[in-house]
């Protein structure tokens, strides 16, 4: 059995920054309305780059810009490609992401090691319309996470069969799981695109972990300024202080040591 070689944290960050730099180049070339978001925005403002105990890179952009990004991404790739844009499930959410094709990850939860297909990545959050009422958003958000929960159940039901006589059953189980997973991911993505960005006054990304109380505003994508993230010039909302205070409160104050937690995965070379 091939032994996996874990990737040091510094190398993971370098890989992510290589992906990020390429994404920024594409977005600037095609004049896409992207911003760095969530912990990445917080890291840029408070630390000038990564939050010391984390290595996330999150980008968000309106749906129409994301569709353009998706269309031109492969044309901007080197040959052979170093990165690829993927949609569908990543861990336990339906977030599009860009991955380094030469790496993989192992997720460690409750003492179990679970291998996932994705690699070192950068998340891309498409932003859509939030609906026309608070009820629209609440109902659509609940439906999205209902579908995501079904995909989690599918992952949870999977058990490999060590007995060779049962491997045919395993093959069919895998096929059925794949079909069910595809169904629920598609339904989740349909929820995300239910309301048009331009037709709605309020906007939202259903894949956010912050719930329906997250306050996203069109001005964040229309009025942007440059900011450095680990030496890479990228776009942030001019009103970044307002956005960060909405999400984190007094974001300049560091959290207690026990709450400074990063990911629960271990990246490795394929």
Which residues does each PLM region occupy?
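Helical (often loop-to-helix) elements that flank the catalytic cores of nucleotide-handling enzymes
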Residues: 70
């Amino acid at each position: 059995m091939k032994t996996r070689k874990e990737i040091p944290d510094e190398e993971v960050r370098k890989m992510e920054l290589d992906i990020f730099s390429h994404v920024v180049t594409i977005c600037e070339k095609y004049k896409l309305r992207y911003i760095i978001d969530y912990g990445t925005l917080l890291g840029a403002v408070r630390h000038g780059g990564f939050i010391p105990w984390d290595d996330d890179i999150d980008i968000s952009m309106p749906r129409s810009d994301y569709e353009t990004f998706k269309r031109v991404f492969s044309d901007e790739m080197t040959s052979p490609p170093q990165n690829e844009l993927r949609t569908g499930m990543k861990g336990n959410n339906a977030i599009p992401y860009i991955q380094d094709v030469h790496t993989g990850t192992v997720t460690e939860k409750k003492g179990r090691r679970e291998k996932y297909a994705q690699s070192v990545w950068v998340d891309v959050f498409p932003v859509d319309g939030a609906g026309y009422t608070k009820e629209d958003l609440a109902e659509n958000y609940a439906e999205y996470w209902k579908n995501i929960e079904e995909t989690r159940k599918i992952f949870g039901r999977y058990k490999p069969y060590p007995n060779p006589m049962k491997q045919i059953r395993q093959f069919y189980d895998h096929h059925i799981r794949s079909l069910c997973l595809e169904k629920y991911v598609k339904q989740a993505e349909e929820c995300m695109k239910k309301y048009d960005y331009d037709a709605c006054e309020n906007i939202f990304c259903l894949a956010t972990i912050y719930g329906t109380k997250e306050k996203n505003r069109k001005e964040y994508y229309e009025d942007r300024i440059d900011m450095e993230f680990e030496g890479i010039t990228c776009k942030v909302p001019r009103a970044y202080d307002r956005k960060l205070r909405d999400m984190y409160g007094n974001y300049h104050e560091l959290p207690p040591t026990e709450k400074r937690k990063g990911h629960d995965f271990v990246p490795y070379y394929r």
